[in-house]
Every structure is written in C-alpha cells, then in structure tokens.
Amino acid sequence: MSSNANSQHSTLAKFAFNIYGSLNHATPSYEGSASPSSSYSSSRSKTNEPYNYRFNKLVYNCEREVTTLSQLNYPLSLSNTFQSDQNLSHHVIIGGRNYLKLLALNEDQSRIVQDINVLDQSSIYTHNSRVPSTNKLNNINTVKAQSDTIGCGLSNGLITVYKVGSNGKCRLIHKFSDHKRCINSLDYVGIRNLYDAPTQMISGSQDGSIKLWDMRSSSPRPMLTISSGSHSDPIRSCQYSPHSQGRNKLVVLSVHDSGALCKFDLRLSNGHGPERKWNIHTGPALSLHIHPEKEYVVTGGRDQKICVFNYGDSQISNRITPDEMINTYGPVMKVRWCLYPDASTSQFGEPLDTFQQSNDFNSSSLYSYDLACSYLNDDSTVAIYNLNRKFIPKEVITTSSNKPIQNFIWANNPGSSRKIWTITKSNVFSSYDLDMHDSLLESEISKPLDELANVTVDWNNGFGDLCLANQEKYEFEITEVESQASDNDMGDIDTEYSSRYERSNSNSVIDESSLIGSSSAEKPPLFRSSTHYSMHMAKSPSPVPRRGSTSFAAHSESQPNLSNMQGLSMSRPKLTRNLSQATEDSSISIGSAPQSNIHLKSKRSFQVSYASPYLVPVSLPLSLNDENVFEILSNNYLISIPDGFTLVDVCLLNASVAASVQRFRECQIWRVLAVSLEEDYVQIDNTTFLSDPELEHNETNQDEKIDDQKDAKSISSDLGNFVGSYNSNSTSTTNYGGLGSLSAKDTTKANNSNNLMDMINRSRVNSMNHLQSISPSGSHTFIRNAIHENKSNENAIVDDDETDAAVHGTEGRIGTSHVSEDLDNENLNILNNAVLNSSPNSAMTTPHPQSNSPNYSNFFSLPKLSSTFMSPIYDEFAEKQEQPRSLKAESLLNNDVSDRTTTKSELTKAIKEEVDNSSGAPLKKAWKSSSLLEKALAHASNEGDIILCSTLSLLFYDSFKQVIPQSSCLDWLGLYIEILQRKRLFVNAIHVVNNAPDDVRSKLKNLTSGDVDLRFFCCWCQKLLVNEKSKEKLKNDVNADFGYWYCDECSQKQSNCIYCNEPCKGLTVVVSLKCGHRGHFGCLREWFIEDENNECPGGCDYSVV
C-alpha cells in the first residue's frame, strides 16, 4: 500500500511539473504550500503524509507578476477535498498581470487546499487547466471581493465582475467600460456585513472621477459620476462608509493626488462635487481605510504621515487638522485598520473599555484597534501602530526574502486573531499571525517596544548637556475621555515633585487640556509682566489674547513655588502644533485669535500614581565644551586661505586664535603643522604646493642649485606678501637678483595683506594682553637679539655644511649697513608679534642682551624674511629663503668659505640625503606634514574636538587626500554644520558649506539640506489657506491679482504688515513675531536690523531681545 501511495505521489508531482514548471524555490516544508502543485498533492495524500507545520505561516509562489489581493468570504464545497475541509469560508484572491487566482484555504487558514484560475472560464476547480495566454490584456490593478462576487479594476479603465459558485466555478457577469484611465480602487455600496450580496459598486480612477454602478442592471453605463472639482485630480483610493448616522445617507470618502480628503453624499441631486474637502497631506495621498466601528478614517501619503480624521457630521464645522498624526520613516503606500480589537490592550493596566467612556464618543474603538502600513519605496516591512503609542511601531514585519511589499490586507479568520496577508514584488504570497508566539516567527516579526530600555540617556551635541528620560513601558498616553463640563479643570494636581512619590497610593489626575490648551491645533498663549507706561492704552494690542485658565504658564504663575522646581513637578505635556500663519510645527504664532473651544466636547487626561514619563536634564560644566569658546573659535578660525597668504600663515593665525582662548594644545598643533609645512613643502606662486614625491626629489637637489636661483626669490615672497611695508624707498630703489621695484599690483596685494593682518591683530589685542610681557619700545630688536643669543649659546647639532663663520661669526662681516638692520626690524615687526602671541610660553621673560651694540655675527646667522623666525627648527629651507646681503659682506663670506673643506656628518646624510640601504627606500622623517596631520586629526577626533577636525579638513583636504578620507571629511563637516545651526551660528554654517572642497560640497549640501513643510492658516477662521476657488477662477486671467492675503472660506483679508500697513501677499516672505503681529521680511529687517530697534513696531511692548 505504501509503495502505491508513493508511486501516485510521484506521478502527480511529475504531472504538476509539466504544467507549472519548477516553482518550489527551496522553500522549507513548514512554510505551507510553496507552489500550486504542493497544495494539491498534499491534500490528496493527507492520509498517508500529514502536513508538517511548525507555525501558522502560509507561503504561495505565484507564477506571474501580481499587484493586488483581497479576501473572499463565501462557503465553497469542493469535491476533491476531504470531509473536514467542506464548507470553506475564507479564501484568497490574488490578481496581477494576466493573472487572477482563487486560493481555497482550510478552516484554520493554515494551508491551501486548492487553487482556481478565475480568468480561464473553462477551469472550474481542477489543476489540469493552463494559465491564460499572454494575448489576453487582463492587467488587474485592484481586486475587491464581497460574498460570492469578485470585482476587478484593470489598468485600461475596464471593470470586470465575476460570480463564484458554491463548487468553485467562476463566470464573468459584467463588464463596465466608462473610465478613461486606470482603475485604482473598488468598493461596494450598502454593505453592512461580510456576507451581504452586493448590488451597487463604486470605482475610483486615475481620470479623477468616481462612478456608481448598478450590478442588477445589464447597462454598461454608470448610474452616477462625481469628481472633486472641475479639473482632473486623480483618485488614489475610495471607500463607502457604513457608519453614516443620517438615514439612508450614502457617504463615500476619497483621497487624491493633491493630498485632499473628500466626502461625497450620493443622495445629493447634483452629485458632481464633494460635500466637504480637507487638505490633510502636503503631497499625494495614496491610501485610506475607514474604521470598523466609528466615523474615523486613516489616510497615508507621500509626505510620510499617517493621519486619523473624524469625518462625522458633528465634527465637520471647524475641523481642519487630523485628530491624530503618525510620522513614519517613509512614504506610505497602503494603510489599513485591523478588523479585530487587540486583546493585548489589557496590558496597559485595566481593559480600556472599562474606563474610556464618553457621552458622544467611545475612545476604546479608536485606541484598541491597530493599524498597519506599507511603504512606497523598495521597503520590505509592514509596520503596525497603535494610537496609544503612536511614536514607535508596535510590531514590524520583515519579509524573509527582503523583497519589497507590494500589497497587504488584514484577514478575517474564525479565531479573531490579528493576521496579515502580504504579497511581495517577488510574487510571493505570505501569511503572518501576529498573535502566534513562535521562535521561528521572531526572525520576521520584531517588537521594537520590547527592545527599548526604561531609562534612556542622550547627549545634546554642542552644548554638553545630558538628559535622562524614564518612562514605564505600558503607561504611555493611556487616555481617558471626560466631560468638559468638569468643575475643576485642573483636577487634583500635586504641586511638589517629591510629594508625588510620598502619596504614591493616591492617584493624581493631570488634565492635559490645562497643559497644552483645549485643542490640539491651538497655539500657546504668551504672558508678559504688566508694564507701567503712560501711553500703554494708546499702543496697539497684541493679536494673541491672554487666556490664563487654559495654560500651563498661567498655572505656574498662580503657584510661585513651581518656579523653583523648573517644571519637574508635572509630567511632560504632549507636543502640539501651533495653528498659525507660519507653520503648524512652529512655536511662533501668527495672526490673531486662535480657534474657539466651543466645538470641543471632550478632553483627554491620563491617570498615573507617580510621574511617568519624566525627563531629568543635567548640565555639565565641561571646560572643553565652553559655549563662548566655541563661538570665538568658529568666528575667528580661518577656514580658507585669503589672497596673499599661505597655508603656513593661516596655521600661525589659527594658533594665535587658539591661544587667545587658552586652548594651548590646539595652539601647539597649529604651530607644529606650520613648521612642518615650511620644512617639507615648496611654495609655487603662493598657492600651489608640490606633492610628497616631488618634494622629496626637490629636497635632494636643492643643494646643487646655484646662488643665482637663491637671488631670484623676490622681496614679495612669503613674508613679503604677509607684510606690506616693502614699498618704501629703501627697497623700491634696490634691485636684488635682477628684480626691479614692486609693481602696482604687487603693492596693492601687499597693502591688502598688511591691512588684513593689522585688523586681525587689533581685534585680538584685548584678549592677548595678559599673554604679552615684552616691552613695547624696541621690541622687535630686543626679541631678535635675544633669540639669537639663545641660539648661539645652546648645544645644538651643527650642520657640517655650514662654515664656522656662519655659526660663530667673524669680524670680517662688517658689510651690512645700519639701513639694512632697520629694514629687518620694520618688516618683521608684525609677524613677530603675531607668532609670539600664538605661543603659550610667550608670557615668559626673554633674557636680556649683554650689550646694546649690534651683533653682526648673530645678524648674519638669521634666516632672513621667513615666517619660521620664531620656529624652533632652523634648517636648509630657511637658508634657501635668505635675505640678499650686501656685496661686501657676500664677498667676505665667499673668501672665507673657499679656504675651508666641508665634511658632512652621518646625521646630516641621514636627514638630507638618501642613504643607500638594502631596500633602496629613503628614510622618512617622523615630523613630516602628512604624519603630523594624521596624528592631529586622530587626537582631535578622539577628544571630540569637532572644530579642529572640521577646520583641518577644510584647509588640508585638497593637499592631503591620502590622509583625510572623503567619508570622514563629510561626517565631520556635516556634524559641524548641524552644531552651528543648533547654536544659531547660521553665517558660520554657510561659510563652511561654501568653503568645503569641491568633491565634498555637493554631498554636503544634500546632507545638510532638508525639506521644510509650511502650512499657513487664516488668522480669522483658522482654516488652511489654499484658495483653490480663486485659483481655479483666475487661472485663465493673466492680470488677476491672486494671492494668499485673503481667505476664500471666510472672505476676509489677512492682517497687514505692522510696519508699512500693506497686505502681506507672499507666503514665504512673511515674518511673524511671538506677540502675534506680522510683516514683510524687508520691513521688519529695516526696523530691527538697520534701525536697530528692539521692540515690536506695533507698540505692544514685545521685545525681540
């Protein structure tokens, strides 16, 4: 018997392979029916090989591209199923490109007992029928099943309706073809439960129309056609509302590409326009779904928002914003309410339906139902949210193949469990039971809430503050709806933070309406201390009324002991959106009176026995994170090389800035980098630097250059550009090395550099007075002689190339006149002061010279006109930039040198020449610029010094790309700009972006720029300013004066500019003050910046400082 069964199973498998091919892509056996063949063969061999399931997950691989699915709740009696599988009531309908299949499931929906090809009318329920040929244009875009009816919306605007028999046979009964474009949504009208037979159907299309069809009639024309307006606004989704309170009222909701939510009443005689229209989303709204019990609809859009809105008649009058809003991490493609309430709501304490009661609204129906959403982009997740905790998903489903989700629905099932059916873009149907606890499901269903800790610590970037948040996991926003007619609005509020823990047994009710206002869209009031001006009554009052009874600030004023507690005596209130002309999310109010509270009939409060959640801010006085120091460094650090400056000069200037705020370590880093740059790099045309290989090659050949090449270095070298005093008569009339006097262009550049240096020194003279202890009189002569005294007396290693005359001096060097000495003193004055100020040890007393007579030997050993004058290293590079000597002194030097034979030491060879070794590679110096820069960046990154990292990246990135990776540079600059913006140093942030390297700038702009959504509301009726009526009416009139200084809804003009009393016609050029007055950007800039006023121009005593 066993061999016959195996033979029969093998034959059926081969037969199924001939029809469908190999469709089982190595799917595990516990994943249910992985192909059409596996479901059929398993049902036939059930008695011999029982189905092996380890959890309730069903997988089916579709052989064609699929886009939509629905559920058919109709009992089927299939002849090829066993007795236990008779009268099956829950089935899956999957549609796609030339594809429409009915998957019959068993009673617990754990496996597929049969699949039926609906498009092939000759196929009843057997498997030996082939799929429809490709020449049939049945590209199904949406499917909706009800009772025994299956409606299909095609991409060509055609609607087909199939009738399903009890034996599984499907036949085509209707074809409707009045739409011009793709069908996006289908629904049935007049349906109250899952098993009612439909008689009417609505369809929403890309052509912007909704059509009503009578399925009892044989006419292919619609009964009614409605649209949202005169122009075509594509309809993404539409649905019939079964919760209409009016008698025989047929309400249909739709969402459009404009982001609008429209409400239609099909009983109206005209039937052409919506009864109500709300602009909820700022981009295309892509999906909607009506709540199973109440008149609430959830919508999702491309603006990454999920909105819950009450569309009931009692809530229509002044509703302009959603009741609830969930911000998601991606554009929302589909959103669905769960069909069953979540039984786990009891985990929030007691069951919600025992205390969430109200006269007009049962909140348990809103907060006990979950909602799920999928995303538009290639995202492989379905996120499940609950309004009790809307800031974090309750569960997240991730497909095992990591393929994007195409569509999903909540499935009806006998056990009333939360079950989701999905199809992916890889054409795989899957079933997920969220209430089934199994270890294998945990890899695909994650619960982010379980992964969070009760206590969270985070740093505030840029300010050095620390925040600790404590929050119980199941006590977040447990809402209770009470009557607004309560005598005590504030309830029993404990005013002391410690007393809330002492009386932990007694519950304290905190009324949220007193904390944030009685409306979620209401802006908070502004309170100021009373003024005593005599002309107070003659001044313009603030448009914002003062309502002390409904604000947290008023309550704080009535209880002065709360001011010492810094707001810790109360639980953290919810963040609200301010209904103003500026934006919903801004705390700045625009316009006048806020929305009235007369339409609000309930208030929300949460009941806790102690403070949960609570936030503990900690301020740490970190010496290395001083805000003033940060601002000084960001303002004064040079992040680019000015004209006439070199990179060495910029490093020295930045060193002086760091020393001025007592950042001596950073000062030394800048100075060491300056010294290493002068040693390793050769400057070409004041801007171009050679790479390391070229520099090393040039260094070995520098000794072979003749003296004429040294003389070719003009007076307008590094220090010549740095100091602009070489246009004097003593230098302009002397031609050294064949160079004439400075041209007009060079003179101008030198003067500009000198002016810039003087300006920098003057701006820092006050901050560096305590570091300077050198006498002003004759300071340059004194410093120069003292330094050469120290240099001649220290035990340094002497280069053998240098003559004794160069080291110790000779009496024959008397050819230098007094004019040359004065010239040196004059030109080196500014640089000496800048470098000495940059040294942390500059405050130490310099040894006095032994005599006041000129020391010619020390003078000739000086490296002339180099910015390494104060550097601790004097090497051959300084000699190469030696100042031209007089002819007499030079002849004496040549005679002295010619009588000597030079011998190089081994140390000189190791430093200056390539020593022959086994590898043949030159010895690398540890103080090369690249090595020092790499170590400086590593140190700054480990210390968290974002200013030093960013400044070094801006200055050295182009020359040292091998040291500074592009990713690191982008991360440092992005974080630096973010901190600058948080500190309101916007000008500095813009300078960082503009001076960023070319290959980093584009990525940096994309990283730092973000979309800002601004929504403007009328200051009188508090409705969104869209003015669609005027826009439609005046779109053909070229001379029409269309704008947003008036409101179409209330037909009133908005407030004029408080400065010029002219209408504010623009949307983005309007600036509003916290007092409620507003005006043009140019007018307020003239008032506050140019005229330097501090108070509001309306005279309401509001001060911006």
UniProtKB/Swiss-Prot annotation:
Its main location: other. GO terms for molecular function: zinc ion binding. InterPro entries: WD40/YVTN_repeat-like_dom_sf (IPR015943), WD40_repeat_CS (IPR019775), WD40_repeat_dom_sf (IPR036322), WD40_rpt (IPR001680), WDR24 (IPR037590), WDR59_RTC1-like_RING_Znf (IPR049566), Znf_RING (IPR001841), Znf_RING/FYVE/PHD (IPR013083). Residues 694-711 have a biased composition (Basic and acidic residues). CDD domains: mRING-H2-C3H3C2_Mio-like. The keyword Repeat applies. The keyword Metal-binding applies. Keywords: Metal-binding, Repeat, Vacuole, WD repeat, Zinc, Zinc-finger. Residues 509-521, 548-569, 577-590 have a biased composition (Polar residues). A zinc finger (RING-type) spans 1057-1100. One of its GO terms (cellular component) is vacuolar membrane. One of its GO terms (biological process) is positive regulation of TORC1 signaling. It is found in: Vacuole. Residues 481-523, 535-590, 692-711, 734-754 are annotated as: Disordered. It comes from the Eukaryota. WD repeats lie at residues 135-172, 178-223, 230-274, 280-319, 377-420, 560-601, 917-959. It holds the Pfam family zf-RING_16. Belongs to the WD repeat RTC1 family. May be involved in a process influencing telomere capping. This is Restriction of telomere capping protein 1. It comes from Scheffersomyces stipitis (strain ATCC 58785 / CBS 6054 / NBRC 10063 / NRRL Y-11545).
